[in-house]
């Protein structure tokens, strides 16, 4: 199976590393060679740390890196069996990418997006193959986190769902099948918790440290909601909250003003 990934950021490079570590050859695409080189260097650094800690052998690291190839040209995707888009969370950009891919890739190619909250069905509608369009939502850091949300759009075929579930399992991941809905499963529960933590802090109820410790010790969470928001990125949290609020129109999903203020200030 020829697997191609678009994007060299945290998620893009992480997804590439996850496939490569599962001994699956993968092509990583970006507009610039510099971005590709930076992503490969990041993956190499990650693997080197694992070797130094004795968690993987040098031979395994070498084999993993050998599974990764790079390109700046969409023409390399013509014979791809699966293309995963891991670009930034902008609907317009995702539509632009898949409109272009639809012209280049063979009719059998499965398209997947790693979106954390946007509509699979809406992105799929810009292509001629909505039955072969699916969500494949990895979690950060992708090489480590076991979960993959497999999201079925309005027209995604059962056959494609089965193929992607099997692929995720073959990678060593645990996939969950999700019918498309705003935020899917994890982010519909998780991100409002981060938003509420910000609200509790803004109301002067407790300090950042005490809010996080309360949830770690009281709810057995490995990380508090405010630390988690910093890990995810407050800009990402805001984008997901806005999707939830716009789709449901429910005040419980309204982004807290402090979250908006921090994002505007560049405190991500």
Cite the ranges covered by each PLM segment.
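NAD(P)+-binding Rossmann beta1-loop-alpha1 motif at the extreme N-terminus of oxidoreductases
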Residues: 1-49, 53, 69
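Helix N-cap / loop-to-helix initiation motif
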Residues: 32, 57, 157, 206-210
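Rossmann-fold dinucleotide-binding core
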Residues: 110-180, 184-188
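NAD(P)-dependent Rossmann-like dehydrogenase/reductase catalytic/cofactor-binding core
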Residues: 22-24, 162, 169-180, 202-203, ...
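Structural motif
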Residues: 6, 29, 64, 71, ...
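Rossmann-like NAD(P)-binding element
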Residues: 35, 49-110, 117-118
């Amino acid at each position: 199976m020829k697997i191609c990934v678009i994007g060299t950021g945290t998620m893009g490079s992480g997804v590439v590393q996850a496939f490569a570590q599962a001994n699956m050859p993968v092509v990583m695409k970006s507009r610039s060679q510099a971005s590709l080189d930076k992503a490969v260097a990041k993956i190499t650094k990650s693997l080197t740390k694992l070797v130094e800690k004795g968690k993987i052998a040098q031979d395994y690291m070498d084999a993993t890196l050998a599974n990764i190839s790079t390109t700046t040209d969409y023409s390399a995707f013509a014979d791809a069996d699966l293309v995963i888009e891991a670009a930034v969370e902008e609907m317009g950009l995702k539509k632009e990418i898949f409109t272009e891919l639809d012209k280049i890739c063979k009719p059998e190619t499965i398209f997947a997006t790693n979106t954390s909250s946007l509509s699979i069905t809406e992105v799929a509608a810009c292509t001629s193959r909505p039955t072969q369009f699916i969500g494949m939502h990895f979690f950060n850091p992708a090489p480590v986190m076991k979960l993959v949300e497999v999201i079925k759009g309005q027209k995604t075929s059962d056959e494609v769902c089965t193929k992607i579930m099997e692929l995720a399992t073959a990678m060593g991941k645990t996939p969950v099948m999700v019918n498309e809905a705003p935020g899917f499963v994890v982010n519909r529960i998780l991100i409002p918790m981060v938003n509420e933590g910000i609200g509790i802090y803004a109301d002067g109820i407790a300090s950042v440290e005490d809010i996080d410790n309360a949830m770690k010790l009281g709810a057995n969470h490995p990380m508090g909601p405010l630390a988690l928001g910093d890990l995810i990125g407050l800009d990402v949290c805001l984008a997901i909250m806005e999707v939830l609020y716009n789709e449901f129109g429910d005040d419980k999903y309204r982004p807290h003003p402090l979250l908006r203020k921090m994002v505007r200030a560049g405190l991500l």
